[in-house]
């Protein structure tokens, strides 16, 4: 979406991952992968707005939710049944009973199902009711006021806090603003909470920090974490990277001295951050506006990049330290620089001194 914007590959991948009905097991047997598939459809819809594809895939979304709803326990929480894998991340978290991070994903799926149902002219009220019930239960059982954070498990009695559920609580806007500030202080900015060691979940954490305006911290993390792999000779980004691990053990994984994937697609998220938050491309597709550009030029000494705008075209940004040049090859763009808003017209160039 922020590099090649190939809607066709996106659609074929979505369909291939889901497979045919009836659904008899989770995608890759992983509970959260099924939920992420649903969220992926929503992400595709945001980027391309393809109603025809949405109508094609909607029945599979409904049946996947029905499959998940059949795997709930007494409080309405989604749990792993026999041969299900509750994964979330390669991390030491308390997975006794229902896992909080999983419920955050599950709640986000109810909201997505409601929104997409309504977009297609269908009744989404049942999904909204399920969302309200689930989020109320999450607050009741998983929020720990003393710790100012969500705990992994309420059944074990350990009150263990990891980053994952708390990141999802902010990312999916499940926690209110007051709780989000507590999470920022007590979890995300707390070095006593174990750091994330996969590029995969670093994506979610950095996305949250970007949304909270912490761009300097995110840029520092990109330079230190992904840059740390480059310093060790990486030419592609890895499945997992823990800077504290000795160099001679960096390729260890799955009990194999060379078991780690050194070219893993889930590690490509700097492309997303740099394009969305630093170059500032936001695909909105509403009220006659296709995209908005809010470039954060204070983070660049110079810049020259071409970004895709859905399937509609591209936009080029060139910056020499004084003059920003924007060349639009897509309809319906707006350049926002502080309070100033400048219309971007396909085939025309805008030059602004900053």
Could you describe each region identified by the protein language model?
Residues 75-89, 179-187, 226-228, 233-247:
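Flexible glycine/proline-rich, aromatic-decorated loop/lid segments
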Residues 216-354:
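Non-catalytic C-terminal accessory modules of carbohydrate-active enzymes
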Residues 25-39, 70-77, 139-151, 196-211, ...:
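Charged/polar, low-hydrophobicity segments characteristic of intrinsically disordered regions
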Residues 20, 156-159, 188-196, 224-230:
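Solenoid-like repeat scaffolds
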Residues 22-25, 85-97, 152-155, 186-193, ...:
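Short beta-alpha connecting loops at secondary-structure transitions
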Residues 1-14, 26-28, 32-39, 44-102, ...:
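Active-site acid/base region of carbohydrate-active enzymes
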Residues 1-6, 37-53, 104-122, 167-177, ...:
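Well-ordered alpha-helical scaffold segments within catalytic/enzyme domains
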């Amino acid at each position: 979406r922020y590099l090649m914007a190939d809607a066709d590959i996106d659609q074929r991948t979505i369909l291939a991952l889901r497979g045919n009905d009836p659904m008899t097991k989770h995608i890759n047997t992983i509970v959260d992968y099924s939920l992420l598939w649903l969220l992926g459809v929503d992400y595709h819809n945001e980027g391309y707005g393809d109603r025809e594809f949405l109508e094609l895939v909607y029945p599979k979304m409904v049946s996947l939710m029905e499959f998940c709803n059949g795997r709930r326990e007494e409080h309405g929480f989604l749990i792993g049944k026999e041969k299900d894998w509750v994964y979330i991340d390669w991390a030491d978290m308390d997975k006794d009973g229902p896992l909080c991070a999983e419920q955050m994903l599950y709640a986000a799926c109810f909201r997505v199902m409601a929104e997409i149902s309504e977009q297609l002219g269908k009744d989404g009220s049942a999904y909204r009711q399920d969302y309200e019930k689930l989020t109320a239960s999450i607050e009741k059982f998983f929020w720990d006021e003393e710790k100012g954070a969500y705990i992994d498990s309420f059944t074990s009695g350990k009150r263990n806090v990891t980053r994952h559920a708390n990141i999802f609580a902010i990312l999916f806007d499940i926690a209110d603003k007051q709780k989000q500030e507590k999470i920022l202080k007590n979890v995300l900015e707390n070095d006593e909470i174990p750091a994330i060691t996969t590029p995969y979940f670093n994506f979610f954490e950095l996305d949250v920090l970007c949304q909270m305006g912490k761009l300097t911290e995110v840029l520092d993390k990109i330079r230190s974490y992904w840059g740390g792999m480059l310093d060790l000779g990486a030419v592609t980004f890895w499945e997992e990277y823990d800077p504290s691990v000795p160099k001679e053990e960096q390729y260890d994984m799955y009990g194999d001295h060379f078991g780690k994937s050194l070219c893993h697609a889930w590690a490509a998220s700097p492309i997303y951050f740099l394009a969305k938050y630093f170059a500032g491309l936001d695909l909105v597709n509403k009220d006659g506006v296709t995209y908005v550009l809010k470039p954060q030029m204070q983070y660049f000494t110079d810049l020259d990049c071409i970004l895709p705008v859905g399937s509609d075209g591209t936009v080029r940004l060139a910056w020499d330290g004084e003059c920003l040049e924007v060349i639009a090859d897509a309809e319906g763009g707006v350049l926002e620089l502080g309070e100033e808003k400048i219309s971007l017209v396909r085939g025309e160039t805008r030059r602004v001194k900053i």
